[in-house]
Structures are given as structure tokens and as C-alpha cells.
């Protein structure tokens, strides 16, 4: 388990207040960004979340192909480009897929889709550009773990990496792909999910870094017109354990388009109000990035 008292010993009120002011002075406590102004906040766009905050677990839910991984990659790249060290838990795809998805965002040819990269049907200029993009990816302070693992083992890895060199963001893609631990052998699946969420929440608090946890809904399995975290298996425990709950809903009218619109809903926000009306952003499928409608605020260079 994650012993809270081992990770976070008692502190005085003076020390807690000093930490609070330290976070306030550090961009209002934000230690990571989504890479999208509508979610990070800017002088032009009313922030929905204000970024990813230290010590908080954010659940990012949506259907398969709805942009969850692209959102996670956008946040990871934005954080890494700003100098923050990122741990990306790739439970669904191999490290090579993660690398190509990140590289696609740096390519200048159009469309730089992962499928085209895999096909190897590229011109000489495109290969040269891909090599340039690959060098940009290689320079990012980004760690990728694509090994099958349990929640406890992943958290132990994160703690070890953080003690070696502090992390700024931890990403899990995605929750339901964690393996069962021995302690879960006789537990119901919903109990296992609840314990895994608690482990990640404790990790965020102990390391005082934001943890972005992706949650997959069943395709077409939403029980309501607009899906919520309760449409995921074990959704009640997930909703309860998260500090923030963000839902991505693709706009059906742009389904299949190279750049489609996605509505972002904030169903739960620690210390703030939810955003039930939704905020539209763009899902650039080819580049595997999210950006604002005007395309101006993403920190990723295309």
C-alpha cells in the first residue's frame, strides 16, 4: 500500500502556509498545463480548469477514439516543453506508438498521421522532416513506461523517479488496463478500480504533482444523452476519488474529419465550479494534439 504518513510526514501550520504561498507564487500553484488555452486560462479565454494542479488527481473520460490520448499527449508535451519532467504510463500502446504520436505533432508536412508514418510511404523530404521531429521528441524530459503493471507498482516507479529527479506530471493511459495486484485476488472488479484510483490519488498528494488518469467509456454505452464518469465501469468510485473530472465528447457533425470538434465538460472541480455547458476545442487527429478553435494557444509547434 501507499503509507500516507511515510510519504507526507506531519508539518506545522507555518510550513503548510509557506507551501501554500509557494504554490500561489508559482503560477497560482499550477505545475502542468493542458496545452490548450481554453483549459489552462489566458487573458483572452475564460479558463475552465486553469491547468493541472499539484497534488490533484484528474480523471479524463471519454469513448474510444474520442481524443483522450491526444489530450494526454498535448498536456505531456506542453509540460515537457516548459521544462517539466513527465512520466507517461502507456498501458494501452507500446512506446513506439507513443513516440510516433508525439513526433506527428512536430511534423510540418500534411497530414503527418501516425498511419502514414507506419506505412513508410513517405517522400525523401517527409522522412527528413520526420527525422527532425524525432530529434525534438528525443530532447523532451519525458519518460515512457509501457510495461504491463499494477497500480501499486506504477506508483512505486513514480515515487522512485520523483526522488531521483522531481516529476511535474504523471499520466496514466488508461486506468482499466492496470493488472490486478495479489491483494485484489478475491475482490470485486469495482473494488479493485476504487483501490487503484485511491493509489493514484495518494500518489498525487504524496509527491505533490498532478496525476492525469484516463478513463475509457464503453463505445455507445452511455446511459445518458451526455456521458459522465458514471458511464465507465466502476464510475462511482472513480468520480468519488478524483479531485477533478473532465469528460470529452466528440461532436458528431465532425466525426471522421481530420480536425474535429470536441466538447470538454468539467463535472467536478476541486475548489471551483463545474463547467456543465461545455467548452469546444479542436481534435487534430493527424497530429494527435488538442488545440483551441482559433488554433492560437496550443504550445505545440506545427
Locate each region found by the language model.
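The Walker A/P-loop phosphate-binding site
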Residues: 3-112, 132, 275
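C-terminal regions of RecA-like/P-loop NTPase motor modules
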Residues: 108, 114-115, 125, 151-170, ...
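Proline-centered loop/turn at the N-terminus of a beta-strand
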Residues: 85, 208-210
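Residues immediately C-terminal
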Residues: 177-180, 247
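Conserved H-loop
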Residues: 91-93, 213-216
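Walker B catalytic acidic pair
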Residues: 174
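Structural motif
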Residues: 59, 144, 169-171
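Cytosolic-facing regulatory segments adjacent to core modules
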Residues: 42, 46-47, 78-166, 180, ...
Amino acid at each position: 500500500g501507499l503509507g500516507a504518513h511515510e510519504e507526507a510526514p506531519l508539518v506545522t501550520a507555518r510550513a503548510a502556509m509557506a507551501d501554500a504561498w509557494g504554490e500561489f507564487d508559482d503560477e497560482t500553484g499550477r505545475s502542468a498545463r493542458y496545452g490548450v488555452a481554453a483549459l489552462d486560462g489566458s487573458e483572452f479565454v475564460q479558463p475552465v480548469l486553469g491547468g493541472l494542479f499539484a497534488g490533484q488527481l484528474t480523471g479524463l473520460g471519454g469513448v474510444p477514439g474520442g481524443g483522450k490520448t491526444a489530450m494526454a499527449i498535448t498536456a505531456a508535451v506542453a509540460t515537457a516543453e516548459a521544462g517539466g519532467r513527465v512520466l507517461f504510463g502507456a498501458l494501452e500502446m507500446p512506446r513506439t506508438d507513443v513516440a510516433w504520436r508525439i513526433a506527428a505533432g512536430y511534423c510540418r508536412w500534411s497530414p503527418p498521421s501516425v498511419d502514414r508514418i507506419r506505412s513508410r510511404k513517405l517522400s525523401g523530404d517527409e522522412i527528413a522532416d520526420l527525422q527532425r521531429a524525432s530529434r525534438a521528441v528525443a530532447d523532451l524530459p519525458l519518460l515512457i513506461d509501457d510495461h504491463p503493471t499494477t497500480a501499486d507498482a506504477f506508483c512505486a516507479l513514480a515515487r522512485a523517479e520523483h526522488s531521483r529527479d522531481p516529476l511535474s506530471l504523471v499520466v496514466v493511459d488508461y486506468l482499466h488496463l492496470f493488472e490486478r495486484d495479489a491483494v485484489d485476488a478475491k475482490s470485486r472488479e469495482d473494488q479493485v478500480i476504487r483501490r487503484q484510483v485511491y493509489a493514484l490519488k495518494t500518489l498525487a498528494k504524496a509527491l505533490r504533482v498532478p496525476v492525469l488518469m484516463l478513463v475509457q467509456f464503453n463505445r455507445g454505452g452511455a446511459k445518458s444523452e451526455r456521458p459522465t464518469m458514471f458511464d465507465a465501469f466502476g464510475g462511482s468510485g472513480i468520480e468519488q476519488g478524483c479531485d477533478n473530472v473532465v469528460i470529452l465528447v466528440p461532436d458528431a457533425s465532425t466525426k471522421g474529419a481530420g480536425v474535429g470538434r470536441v466538447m470538454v465538460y468539467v463535472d467536478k472541480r476541486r475548489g471551483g465550479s463545474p463547467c456543465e455547458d461545455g467548452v469546444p476545442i479542436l481534435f487534430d487527429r493527424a497530429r494527435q494534439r488538442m488545440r483551441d478553435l482559433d488554433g492560437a494557444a496550443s504550445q505545440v509547434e506545427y
